[in-house]
A protein has these predicted regions:
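Conserved ABC ATPase "signature" region
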Residues: 108-126
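Helix-to-loop junction immediately C-terminal to a conserved catalytic motif
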Residues: 50
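Helix N-cap at the start of a conserved alpha-helix in ABC-type nucleotide-binding domains
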Residues: 166-168
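Catalytic Walker B motif of ABC-type/P-loop ATPase nucleotide-binding domains
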Residues: 155-158
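Hydrophobic anchor residue at the start of the ABC signature
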Residues: 144
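Conserved ABC ATPase signature
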Residues: 130-134, 138
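Conserved ABC transporter NBD signature motif
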Residues: 58-66, 75
Length: 212
């Protein structure tokens, strides 16, 4: 079953074409990697899938439904976007992990959060650690598990391993492999060969088009 289907999707900004006639499918539980030169439109595709911007032509279907007709807050619990530069809030790690639950008036499960920290090799005391004290790799791990705590069906990853050291990259790749093994879907933009090798499908994007 396809979790995503893009049909002749286009995106433009002030008459400048960014994406042209983008068509592809993503199977449920698949790992898809988008590759290509910088500025080719890869990140724009992720933003369309995340509902952060709207296509100017064509249609994007999520589980058979046009995403333009879906309730976005509900959709974004199913489809979670991870930025290359982690966006963190508040003073502490716990503030960050709890924030999405607070704004949705949902209960925060601290035990689950501690297990998530452990899965990325961060000790329990990290919950009280200040964001300003975290390294770049630690910030990326916190941002990633914040997204995973909602148990989304799809993770959209925009070069999240860029700038990570080898040890942190290994930890993150293990977490992503476990996430996919549970039947979830990964769609990523990356230049990292180990991540490209882990994909079931690779699409090359050049000049705002899918190259075949």
């Amino acid at each position: 079953m396809n979790i995503f289907q893009l049909q002749s999707v286009g995106l433009s900004d002030n008459d400048k074409s960014i994406l042209t006639d983008i068509s592809f499918t993503v199977a449920e539980g698949e790992r898809l990697t988008l590759v290509g030169p910088s500025g080719s439109g890869k990140s724009s595709i992720l933003k369309l899938l995340a509902g952060l911007t709207s296509a100017t032509s064509g249609t994007i279907f999520f589980q058979g439904r046009n995403i333009a007709e879906l309730d976005m807050p509900t959709y974004r619990r199913e489809v979670s976007y991870c930025f290359q530069q982690p966006v963190l809030f508040g003073q502490t790690v716990q503030d960050n992990l709890q924030f999405p639950f607070t704004i949705r008036q949902l209960a925060f499960d601290q035990t689950k959060a501690l297990k998530a920290l452990e899965s990325v090799h961060l000790a329990p005391e990290f919950l009280s650690k200040k964001i300003t004290e975290l390294s770049g790799g630690e910030k990326q791990r916190v941002a990633l598990i914040r997204n995973l705590l909602f148990e989304p069906k799809v993770l959209l990853l925009d070069e999240i391993s860029a700038g990570l050291d080898a040890e942190t990259k290994t930890i993150v790749n293990k977490l992503l492999a476990d996430y996919q093994a549970a039947g979830n879907t990964l769609i990523e933009v990356t230049h990292d060969q180990s991540e490209i090798d882990a994909a079931q499908k690779i699409l090359r994007i050049e000049g705002g088009r899918v190259q075949v």
